From Swiss-Prot:
The keyword Cytoplasm does not apply. One of its GO terms (biological process) is menaquinone biosynthetic process. This is 2-succinyl-5-enolpyruvyl-6-hydroxy-3-cyclohexene-1-carboxylate synthase. Homodimer. The gene is menD. It comes from Shigella boydii serotype 4 (strain Sb227). It catalyses: isochorismate + 2-oxoglutarate + H(+) = 5-enolpyruvoyl-6-hydroxy-2-succinyl-cyclohex-3-ene-1-carboxylate + CO2. Catalyzes the thiamine diphosphate-dependent decarboxylation of 2-oxoglutarate and the subsequent addition of the resulting succinic semialdehyde-thiamine pyrophosphate anion to isochorismate to yield 2-succinyl-5-enolpyruvyl-6-hydroxy-3-cyclohexene-1-carboxylate (SEPHCHC).
């Protein structure tokens, strides 16, 4: 009997089971203990294989692939701290709904807690963050193959969103020629091997039913808040709100076209919040709201009803409003709850939104961070997509720009960490094959710098804008102690990214004005490669411009 051969047959059943649930992309890190899984994945022609030497980046690469494909993405890593490096991506997926299947190789039980190398307690290490956790036994023919495949099917068949952790212990030897060991065990699955359906089929249903009193509420004064959603959903939501005559407050991730732009500016005006107080119902479609003023208004508003519609489970409302939590696909929910043509009831807010945008436009000529955020829609590639980082840059784009309706926008706004942003952007590009504009800050770029290796492999032009304001300038917007702000919060690194781009053989530009930036973009969109554009800006201008605009718009 060959242990290595049966390890591979066991792994082949696991990998084949994944294909029956739509898994096509599989991300693999180097490792010895994961050899059975890696070789089984390599031999399965259903998979598109991705590799990376850093497990944290690999997890985020998978996250980006899942964001675009809307299908589960598998990750294979070896045992030990390699597994722990998947934690950030798993947490993000749990909050934003992407499906990740984490296949973590492990030492067999007799090598745990006895001083064996690279052996840690892996079962349960992700606590409550996976939607499902499976701790498989070591491969043995005493356990029928139908148990193994149905165990995988149950976890994936009932997966609505988030991650599945499948811990896979393998005993040595891990290498060797294949023989007939376990062949009859494998063949007991019969014609399942020629089929394309799961062994065990389950169909989870979390769809909320139609709200029977919608005909009543749609005649009231309402407000639509649009959070994270797909591009197609964004266009439908914009039309739905327009038909109802309800003001639409669109987040940067809503892809609604933000018909009332600069919401995070005009929500600081008392006239706007006073008018919004007249709303009898608020319907929030999508979660992960970005703007500080939007979140403040959302927390303080007191309509008769507050509805939240999202296909992710959970409350999704830090303000704990009285109302309804409706778990549904947004587009499907809109069809069940059609709009009735009515005249707009808000008068003051459209005027304030226009004046806020004009105030932003009046400042657009200076070469700076806030101005780039406002101009970002001018630089979007045709038939492309946008990936926005976290901290100051996403807040500036949310407050100062107006993105086109239906233009795809991606981000990691679940836990809102700055780890893995470049890796996620790489996954977004690979899954879509579209030209991609990604924008992050300098600390975010440093945090995931080795992901530039992933950006060497793109199928369409990708431009990475690094806004270098020399530190975490988001803390300039917070009441951090002035005496310790630079040392303990901003942490300026005084670095530039030309040599990093050169190390990974990526094109690089460092424009000094808008004309040079436009020239760099024109060059970048011509070829299917990655271009790093470093925009070096004054460290405080972005935060100060936002604060000045907030003060100006609050007094309109």
């Amino acid at each position: 009997m060959s242990v290595s051969a049966f390890n591979r047959r066991w792994a082949a059943v696991i990998l084949e089971a994944l294909t029956r649930h739509g898994v096509r992309h599989i991300c693999i890190a180097p490792g010895s203990r994961s050899t059975p899984l890696t070789l089984a994945a390599a031999e399965n022609s259903a998979f598109i294989h991705h590799t990376h030497f850093d497990e944290r980046g690999l997890g985020h690469l998978a996250l980006g692939l899942a964001k675009v494909s809307k299908q589960p993405v598998a990750v294979i890593v070896t045992s030990g701290t390699a597994v722990a490096n998947l934690y950030p991506a798993l947490i993000e997926a749990g909050l934003t709904g992407e499906k990740l299947i984490l296949l973590t190789a492990d030492r067999p039980p007799e090598l745990i807690d006895c001083g064996a190398n690279q052996a840690i307690r892996q079962p349960g290490m992700f606590a409550s963050h996976p939607t499902h956790s499976i701790s498989l036994p070591r491969p043995t023919q005493d356990i029928p193959a139908r148990w193994l495949v149905s165990t995988i099917d149950h976890a994936l068949g009932t997966l609505h969103a988030g991650g599945v952790h499948i811990n896979c212990p393998f005993a040595e030897p891990l290498y060797g020629e294949m023989d007939d060991t376990g062949l009859s065990w494998q063949q007991r699955l019969g014609d399942w091997w020629q089929d394309d359906k799961p062994w065990l089929r389950e169909a989870p249903s979390l769809e909320s039913e139609k709200q029977r009193d919608w005909f009543f509420w749609r005649q009231k004064r309402g407000v639509v808040v649009a959070g994270r959603m797909s591009a197609e959903e964004g266009k439908k939501v914009a039309l739905w709100a327009q038909t109802l005559g309800w003001p639409l407050i669109g987040d940067v991730l809503s892809q609604t076209g933000q018909p009332l732009p600069c919401a995070d500016l005009w929500l600081g005006n008392a006239k706007a919040t006073s008018e919004l107080q007249q709303a009898q119902i608020v319907v929030q479609l999508g979660s992960s709201l970005t703007g500080k003023r939007l979140l403040q208004w959302q927390a303080s508003c007191e309509p008769e009803e507050y509805w939240i519609v999202d296909d992710i489970e959970g409350r999704l409302d830090p303000a704990h409003h009285r109302g309804r939590r409706l778990i549904a696909n947004i587009a499907d929910w809109l069809e069940l709850h059609p709009a009735e043509k009515r005249q707009p009831w808000c008068v003051e807010i459209p005027r304030l939104a226009e004046q806020a945008m004009q105030a932003v436009i009046a400042r657009r000529d200076a070469f700076g961070e806030a101005q780039l955020a406002h101009r970002i829609s001018d630089y979007l590639p045709e038939q492309g997509q946008l990936f926005v980082g976290n901290s100051l840059v996403v807040r500036l784009i949310d407050a100062l720009s107006q993105l086109p309706a239906g233009y795809p926008v991606y981000s990691n706004r679940g836990a809102s960490g700055i780890d893995g942003l470049l890796s996620t952007a790489a996954g977004v590009q690979r899954a879509s094959g579209k030209p991609t504009l990604a924008i992050v800050g300098d600390l975010s770029a440093l945090y995931d710098l080795n992901a530039l290796a992933l950006l060497r492999q793109v199928s369409a032009p990708l431009v990475l804008i690094v806004v270098n304001n020399n530190g975490g300038q988001i803390f300039s917007l917070l009441p951090t102690p002035q005496s310790e702000r630079e040392r303990f919060y901003l942490m300026p690194q005084n670095v530039h990214f030309e040599h990093a781009a050169a190390m990974f053989e990526l094109k690089y530009h460092r424009p000094q004005n808008w004309q040079e930036l436009e020239t760099a973009f024109a060059d970048a969109w011509r070829t299917p490669t990655t271009t790093v554009i470093e925009m070096v800006v004054n460290d405080t201008d972005g935060a100060q411009t936002l604060q000045q605009l907030l003060a100006q718009v609050s007094h309109l």
